[in-house]
């Protein structure tokens, strides 16, 4: 655990994510919790640490102000509740943080904002300037305008992308659970807490995480997936019980609580990280055993010869998933060809592409520079 203590001491830019299940009660926003959160983040801020807060809670905050009998069972209803709740949530954040001498800013994003490289860079520049000004950005999904196919799905996913945007060196995820367990503690009384996870990629997340919170859109699976992504980026994750009193202050004072997830020794480039996670894959490429070995052990590009099946329709330049014959996900990457052309050239040597398509702009189906292995989808 000494590495954990040292990393906490050396952290200069932290992304803190707080979920709806922590932030709200049946009556609405938990004002006492926001006050304690502001107090703890102010202490870190005074030490010179940059803080970025990814906050859920807008829909839950607006729930009590919708008409009696109205249900939040479709996207327009959730968007309307979010529009009500977001302003109330930010008002409470602004008022509370100001009492501790902190200035906050509201940043609302959609997945489309991070999908396009120019808008991604614009978001990065804006957040960088806010942090230079010692302002605390409070980030949430822009639920009111997000369409279903471009939703982040949950703020754990959003937070995992923000780690890359702001170049954070620590990720703290405040949840309703007291860290990570070897299996779902709600269903298994003998579940054991995990104080430290050395290699998150070796875990069977589907078996460990089979439930979600009542008021949130995510669950432990989404939190572990976000931690998996953070590990690839070289960022450690700390999953804590957000309702534990002054929990952030206590762990920075050396108390060992929650679950510490160790990052990969060799991190991926920020560009590859963005390529892999800016949107969902548009299709699958099924590859043979030889291609699988070349990818996993040789760091090679994916050649058409190793592809045995194409699933889905996609354009050249779109993100696709690479799977083996058993359906296991191996990687994601940008396809050099559209799905129609891939079907024509799969199983063929690269030297045969021109005779089949009439042109050969690329000898590979996915170049290794545009390929991320073990993507946490």
Curated annotation (Swiss-Prot):
Reaction(s) the record says it catalyses: L-glutamate + ATP = L-glutamyl 5-phosphate + ADP
Keyword terms of this UniProt record: Amino-acid biosynthesis, ATP-binding, Cytoplasm, Kinase, Nucleotide-binding, Proline biosynthesis, Transferase
Source taxon at top rank: Bacteria
Binding site for substrate: 56, 143, 155
GO terms assigned for molecular function: ATP binding; glutamate 5-kinase activity; RNA binding
Binding site for ATP: 17, 217-223
SMART domains found in the cross-reference section: PUA
PROSITE patterns per the UniProt record, alphabetical: GLUTAMATE_5_KINASE (PS00902), PUA (PS50890)
UniProt subcellular location: Cytoplasm
Matches recorded under PANTHER family: GLUTAMATE 5-KINASE, ISOPENTENYL PHOSPHATE KINASE
Stated role: Catalyzes the transfer of a phosphate group to glutamate to form L-glutamate 5-phosphate.
NCBIfam families from the UniProt entry: proB
HAMAP family assigned: ProB (MF_00456)
Similarity remark: Belongs to the glutamate 5-kinase family.
Protein name, entry field: Glutamate 5-kinase
Gene: proB
